[in-house]
Amino acid sequence: MLVAVDGVDGAGKTTLADELAPMLGAAGKPVIRATVDAFHYPRARRYRLGRSSPEGFYRDSYDYAALKATLLEPLGMGGSRRYRRAIFDVDADRPVDGIEEVAAAGSILLFDGIFLHRPELRDYWDFSIFLDVPCEKNHHLSRQPSWNVGLPDPSSPDHRYAEGQRLYFRECNPKRAASIVIDNVDLAAPAIVERL
């Protein structure tokens, strides 16, 4: 089973996935944790449209073909169960020789990241969660001054991220595509607000 935890930067995706993993494990389900952040493109590709380009952030951040080939397809229905959790170290800006692992039968992939309801990914998910946190309430970026006043200053690095997220919302409508939408403004009290 492939489960996606999607939401804007700083919405609490990794936190929620990390909290769900041991619960599923305690219920006797083998869990594989992975993140889209291990599938970045190299820096040259990510910034080919410019360091402040929202379009570049949305279109060129992640290597979805590699994600599908090395993780989603092997773990999907009829897949080989031989997978890799990572292909790229974004901090070192270099590929990693990720260890090929073999999933136990019945494993659940709990995968977190941004942009997970893009057309090229959405059909892979057996279940998906979208964490609904407005940009101004974003747990990470709300501390950045430019995020607190609506649209970030176009010269701010935050402009790339905020407008890239808005592009994703316009093109993919992740709230509509998700199996459930969780209001995660209050990390201590998440609330399901929509279900398919």
Predicted regions and their residues:
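Conserved nucleotide-sensing/catalytic segment adjacent to the nucleotide-binding pocket
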Residues: I32-T35, Y41-R94, I108
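ATP-dependent NMP and nucleoside kinases share a basic, alpha-helical "lid"
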Residues: D93-W147
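Conserved lysine of the Walker
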Residues: K13
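P-loop (Walker A) phosphate-binding loop of NTP-binding proteins
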Residues: V8
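Short hydrophobic/aromatic beta-strand immediately N-terminal to the Walker A/P-loop
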Residues: V3-A4
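Hydrophobic positions on the alpha1 helix immediately C-terminal to the Walker A/P-loop
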Residues: L16
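NTP-dependent small-molecule kinase module
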Residues: D123, F127, L131, H140, ...
